[in-house]
From Swiss-Prot:
GO cellular-component term (any): cytosol
UniProt-listed InterPro entries: Aminoacid_DH-like_N_sf, NAD(P)-bd_dom_sf, THF_DH/CycHdrlase, THF_DH/CycHdrlase_cat_dom, THF_DH/CycHdrlase_CS, THF_DH/CycHdrlase_NAD-bd_dom
Protein name as it appears in the record: Bifunctional protein FolD
GO BP annotations listed: L-histidine biosynthetic process; methionine biosynthetic process; purine nucleotide biosynthetic process; tetrahydrofolate interconversion
Organism: Shewanella baltica (strain OS195)
Record note on quaternary structure: Homodimer.
Keywords: Amino-acid biosynthesis, Histidine biosynthesis, Hydrolase, Methionine biosynthesis, Multifunctional enzyme, NADP, One-carbon metabolism, Oxidoreductase, Purine biosynthesis
Domain of life: Bacteria
Pathway linked to the protein: One-carbon metabolism; tetrahydrofolate interconversion
Keyword hit for Hydrolase: yes
GO molecular function: methenyltetrahydrofolate cyclohydrolase activity; methylenetetrahydrofolate dehydrogenase (NADP+) activity
Length: 284
């Protein structure tokens, strides 16, 4: 068996095209154009790349994109003050603060300062809580994008044994909640997990988000499983690879996401979907 590739790049482009059409329809109806504020603190190269991609995608679908680039030395109070002003700005539907933040700024304080109706990253405890209670509104972007990828396979998720490897607030934990909502029997694995191999080998669906190249050997993948690889790791030779040993896993899986071109584009597409949702549901 050779796995079918889940083409995140193509699916994300399809979403962006639909969003662009909706923005055009809003303009023609005399409605306001959705606005996203993107805040970057410091000059971390990876963060600059991510932020650049988000701003470019915004412009592509016709959203208003406002950029706020702050110095690394920016105080926590300065950042919170900016968020307060964006919370009250009627032209802004979504506020995104690029993580990680410098050590002197507390991530959780910043996340909780963003109004839940403008939390298009889906990180606010209110929005995570809504997902936990099976009434999601603004959902965490990467897990939301992954669910779109899984749905694209046409596989019925109800009753699947799913394993999530990684328990971060950004991916692993909300991913577990998304899979529960989709009817999966879900196991979340982390650094204290025993018998990881045993759990992976019986999984119908595996989502891996640990940031370690080739962390999951391909031979662990159950024949016919769906493999979602969230990792994006650059090797010393410059090659980008995921957290799963791709070549071997692709021989066992029924569907697999490539790295790059799998999950990454979907995170940004989901961010754009959330921004339009916030405009339509909360701010029109």
């Amino acid at each position: 068996m050779t796995a079918q590739i889940i083409d995140g790049k193509a699916i994300a482009q399809s979403i962006r095209t639909k969003l662009s059409e909706k923005v055009t329809a809003r303009k023609e109806a005399g409605q306001r154009i959705p606005g996203l504020a993107v805040v970057l603190v410091g000059a971390d190269p990876a963060s600059q790349v991510y932020v650049g991609s988000k701003r470019k995608a915004c412009e592509e679908v016709g959203f208003i994109s406002r950029s706020y680039d702050l110095e690394t030395s920016c105080s926590e109070d300065e950042l919170l003050s900016l968020i307060d002003s964006l919370n009250e700005d009627p032209t802004i539907d979504g506020i995104l603060v690029q993580l990680p933040l410098p050590a002197h700024i507390e991530d959780s304080k910043v996340i909780e300062r963003i109004r839940p109706d403008k939390d298009v990253d889906g990180f606010h405890p209110y929005n995570v809580g809504r997902l936990a209670q099976r009434i999601p509104v603004l959902r965490s972007c990467t897990p939301m994008g992954i669910m779109t990828l899984i749905k694209s396979t046409g596989v019925d998720t109800y009753g699947l044994d799913a394993v999530v490897v990684g328990a971060s607030n950004i991916v692993g934990r909300p991913m577990t909640l998304e899979l529960l909502l989709a009817g999966c029997t879900t196991t979340t694995c982390h650094r204290f997990t025993k018998n990881l191999e045993q759990k992976i080998r019986i999984a119908d669906l595996v989502v891996v988000a640990v940031g370690k190249p080739g962390f999951i050997p391909g031979e662990w993948i159950k024949p016919g499983a769906i493999v979602i690889d969230v990792g994006i790791n650059r090797l010393d030779n410059g090659t980008l690879v995921g957290d799963v040993q791709y070549d071997v896993a692709a021989q066992n899986a029924s569907f697999i996401t490539p790295v790059p071109g799998g999950v990454g584009p979907m995170t940004i597409a989901s961010l754009l979907e959330n921004t339009l949702y916030a405009a339509e549901q909360y701010h029109d």
